[in-house]
Amino acid sequence: MSMLRLQKRLASSVLRCGKKKVWLDPNETNEIANANSRQQIRKLVKDGLIIRKPVTVHSRARCRKNTLARRKGRHMGIGKRKGTANARMPEKLSWMRRMRILRRLLRRYRESKKIDRHMYHSLYLKVKGNVFKNKRILMEHIHKLKADKARKKLLADQAEARRSKTKEARKRREERLQAKKEEIIKSLSKEEESGKK
C-alpha cells in the first residue's frame, strides 16, 4: 500500500477542510497515488474517489433537556453548587434590579398624579434606605399612606364642621340673649313711662 499523505493534504486544500475529514477510496489507492497535482485531485473528487466526510453530529438534545430541568429547579441542590451565593447571584445585581423596579414604580405613580412630589421624595429616600423588600410592599405602603392622609383630612373636615357649628350656635345664643335683654329693657322703660304718667 502506497503512502497517500500528499494526496490527503492536497485534497484537504481543494475541499477546504481538515485532513481528517478527507476520505480516500481504499479500492482505488493506485489511481489516487498517481495523482500528484491539485488538478488531478479535483478530477478524483469529481469522480467520487475522494470525498469530504460529513460533519460529526454534536447533539444538544441532552443539554436542552437538562437546561429545562434546571429551570424547574432540578440538579440545583446543595451538592451541585460550586460558587458562593454571591458568586452565583451577585448581591449588587439583585440590589440594582430591585432599585430600578421600585424607582420606576415611584416615577410612574408621580407622573400619573397618584402621589405628589413630596411623598415621592420621602419614598425615594426610603427605597434607597432598603425599607421596602419588593414592589408589593411599596405599593401597600403607598395605599396605606394615602388612606391615612384621606382619614386625617376627613377628621379635620369633621372637626372644622363641628367648630363652625358650635360657633354658629354660640352666635345664635348670644343674639337671642341680646334680643331678650333688649326686650326686657324695652318693657322696663315702658313700665317706667306708664308709672310716671
From Swiss-Prot:
Disordered, as annotated region: 157-197
Alphabetically ordered keywords of this record: Cytoplasm, Ribonucleoprotein, Ribosomal protein
Disulfide bonds: none
Assembly description: Component of the large ribosomal subunit.
Gene from which this protein is expressed: rpl19
Function: Component of the large ribosomal subunit. The ribosome is a large ribonucleoprotein complex responsible for the synthesis of proteins in the cell.
Keyword DNA repair: no
Any one GO CC term of the record: cytosolic large ribosomal subunit
Keyword Nucleotidyltransferase applies: no
PROSITE patterns named among the record's database cross-references: RIBOSOMAL_L19E (PS00526)
Subcellular location: Cytoplasm
InterPro entries assigned to the protein according to its UniProt record, in alphabetical order: 60S_ribosomal_eL19_sf, Ribosomal_eL19, Ribosomal_eL19_CS, Ribosomal_eL19_dom, Ribosomal_eL19_dom1, Ribosomal_eL19_euk
GO MF term set: RNA binding; structural constituent of ribosome
GO biological process: translation
Protein name as annotated: Large ribosomal subunit protein eL19
Family the entry assigns: Belongs to the eukaryotic ribosomal protein eL19 family.
Gene3D superfamilies cross-referenced by the UniProt entry: 1.10.1200.240, 1.10.1650.10
Compositional bias per record (Basic and acidic residues), positions renumbered to this chain: 159-197
